Amino acid sequence: VDSDGRVDELVPVMMRHGVNAYLPFEVQAGSDIEEFRRLYPRLGIIGGLDKNALADEAPPAAMHRELDRAARLLEHGGYIPGCDHLIPPNVPWKKWCDFLGQLRRLTGA
């Protein structure tokens, strides 16, 4: 299910009715994919990495925190890494390509 905003109250209801994966888990709405993984270990999680960590004004450590988060979820399985929504125009192309390259290394793609 693609659901914008905060979905923590919807997930258990939707799972009871057969939904087994969600995206994009918006960080700005308070969604924390590591918390969702802890609460719902069988839920497929897609996205959930903070797109603003890639913004031109964001420090490099912000992107590395998101990559570390992706690595932790990938270890568990049931996770497709990606950003928490469309990539905004303040994300430089070079930074985006670097981020994607590092995600590829994490996933073995």
What are these regions (language model features)?
Residues 1-109:
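Active-site loop segments of alpha/beta catalytic cores
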